[in-house]
């Protein structure tokens, strides 16, 4: 009974951060609205400067819960530049917590307020946050044939003309990779095979349009492209089968003990501009991600096997110690009979 209560209480750990984050959102948006109204008679770049500062303060509070409160260990591979840069951030997508990983990296460059997102169009109806993300410089896009290239170019061009600092986060897969949604994975792999591209197993085939438009439109404004690969530990069975990545509540409950972030900085001048070559380039980056995730699975399995082996050795050692103590307390004649029978 007591154990069940403890387990249930622990599973509700996310209620505190959820209550704080949602509870403070109206006050944050109210203060932002007042500033937005006041800034209509001020230069546009001044609005973005103050907005970035206010957004950074709010996101720092959010990040505290995800990075400190949870106790999840963050392992970063690669060297993050110390100075702020204007970048496009490209990452694999498998969890509703993926956006917080961008915050974890941005804050290490003191660029948390500059984080903006390319989001699927349906998220603009998200209560409280949906409209604000657009005002903060984010871009809502529709998929495939409904993608509005002109609208995205116009939005990004207006930002760059003002000299707005840019940390634009894009998830090129367009939707989250979930090993339980086999139809989505099969369709993605079939499309890659049809286009003559390598078939990927642990990520989805990336869609190129939003990434290409962003890099092409802001090429003179950008310093680099950040190529990010995220792997959540603790989502493999002993047989090596992959479970879905943790949701935000699961992440806050530390159901993921460790998150691995592979950081790779790419010179924007080395990225091809022509759509055909850009598609190949982007797919090659996701091939590398696919291989990293395979290697990560192998390492996790080896770690799991090592832990099981250590437990087995420990249990065997305990058994032998018990046997020795038992033998020491046994009469000599009885011990000799046991050994002869053995």
What do these predicted regions represent?
Residues 1-32, 303-333, 342:
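Alpha-helical bilayer-embedded segments of polytopic membrane proteins, i.e.
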Residues 16-23, 27-38, 53-57, 68, ...:
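Alpha-helical membrane-targeting segments
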Residues 164, 185-315, 319-322, 326-327, ...:
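Catalytic lobes of large eukaryotic enzymes
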Residues 65-246:
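Soluble catalytic domains of membrane acyltransferases
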Residues 40, 44, 331-342:
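Interhelical loop segments of eukaryotic multi-pass membrane proteins
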Residues 6, 49, 53, 146, ...:
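Charge-dense, low-complexity intrinsically disordered segments
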Residues 1-88, 93, 100-101:
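Membrane-anchoring hydrophobic helices of lipid-metabolizing enzymes
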